[in-house]
Amino acid sequence: MTVTNKPVKPANVPVMDFEAIHASVGNERKKYLRQLDEAWSHHGAIYVINHSIGTRTLEEAFAWCKKFFDLPLAVKNSVHIPPDVSKHFQGWTGTGEAISSQGVWDPDEIERLRKETPTELKEAMELQDPCGTYPPGAPDLNLVEQHLPGFLDFLKKWFAACYKQSLQNMRLVCEILGMEDLDYIGKKFEPRHMSTHSTWNYFLGQPVSQLASGSANRLNAHTDYCQFTMLFQDMVGGLELHDYEEDIYRPVPPIKGAMIVQVGDLLEKQTNGRWRSALHRVTAPSRYMYEGSAGDDDELVQRYSLVFFGHLNLDEMIEPLPGCEKQGKWSTLEWKDRMTAGQWLARRVALEYERKTAATVM
């Protein structure tokens, strides 16, 4: 089939070199901080090169991710996410079990969307800090370790690396906002508090024609419910970011070794709308959607992504940060109730995963 979607230019997301930023001083540093401020306000996202996680750790992470999703269904089911996922946010989910949505708060409306919209053709593994204390009823990752020796050791390495980078992100936020204490946010951000988590995604191969026509889907448009998202794509592509000015989605092509740092709902709320929570989705790579042609029988290659969500400690109230007393331009998601980060997380997770009737695992 020939893809007839009109050509769309990629999102103009800036590429920021964190090594250069951390080494900068004086006016050069002020320039970098201003660029970050503008990017998170306009796009809600940046590319980051030369980050602290490193190429080797990323390559290991993608290898472990693929090994996990290649496991037999029975093994993955042994660590299936519990029905009350808002209390035990860890475990594997199969195709059709979760649904991403934006601004839908009614569980009945979520059920209608599940029935009437294309299924998100992906599997996911939700992971919490392996050094943390899990509540009773949480899936036992030792069941994965039995089939993938070294899995838990790598998870410890992965969380430590992502946590280190997250703290660097938070220090930059504090510096941009003019705080004297650059660890102000980091002190409210502890991985073993069991709020911060990582998601590994496996997007199944499917005909390009289905994605281009909208009859199939990979990941619905949504914002993330954290402070910052650190996203690592493979080189397949398919991520798109909403352009509010043109009201279209623009591709965010992968850059090898780079991470994408996106503002989440919590940070938009904490900055009082100064920065924008990034509305994004996953579909076919732009070369199929907008630029070329593919035969009807062509299968879209599989896609993997690794995501780390930086999140406030669960007992912290969601309120504006120092320096953000003035109302900004963004209000991506409205919620008037004053609540803790834990209440917000439970609310969003329950809508995404919990349902009235059991899903069929594919």
UniProtKB/Swiss-Prot annotation:
PROSITE patterns (UniProt xref): FE2OG_OXY (PS51471)
Keyword match Metal-binding: yes
Gene Ontology molecular functions: dioxygenase activity; metal ion binding
Pfam families named among the record's database cross-references: 2OG-FeII_Oxy, DIOX_N
Domain Fe2OG dioxygenase: 199-312
Positions contributing to Fe cation binding: H222, D224, H280
First and last residue of the signal peptide: none
Biotechnology usage: Loline alkaloids show broad-spectrum anti-insect activity, and different lolines may have different biological activities. In vitro tests of NFL, NAL, NML, and semisynthetic loline derivatives with long carbon-chain acylations on the 1-amine have shown that many are effective against both fall armyworm larvae and European corn borer larvae, but the effects seem to differ depending on the modifications. N-Formylloline reduces the weight gain of fall armyworms by deterring feeding, and does not significantly affect corn borers.
BP GO terms, sorted: alkaloid metabolic process; small molecule biosynthetic process
Keywords assigned: Alkaloid metabolism, Dioxygenase, Iron, Metal-binding, Oxidoreductase
Cofactor(s), names only, from the UniProt record: Fe(2+)
Annotated pathway: Alkaloid biosynthesis
Gene3D superfamilies linked to this entry: B-lactam Antibiotic, Isopenicillin N Synthase, Chain
InterPro entries xrefs: DIOX_N (IPR026992), IPNS-like_FE2OG_OXY (IPR044861), IPNS-like_sf (IPR027443), Iron_ascorbate_oxido_reductase (IPR050231), Oxoglu/Fe-dep_dioxygenase_dom (IPR005123)
Protein's job: 2-oxoglutarate-dependent dioxygenase; part of the gene cluster that mediates the biosynthesis of loline alkaloids, potent insecticidal agents composed of a pyrrolizidine ring system and an uncommon ether bridge linking carbons 2 and 7. Lolines are structurally differentiated by the various modifications of the L-amino group and include norloline, loline, N-methylloline, N-acetylloline, N-acetylnorloline, and N-formylloline.
Family: Belongs to the iron/ascorbate-dependent oxidoreductase family.
Stated name of the protein: 2-oxoglutarate-dependent dioxygenase lolO1
Name of the encoding gene: lolO1
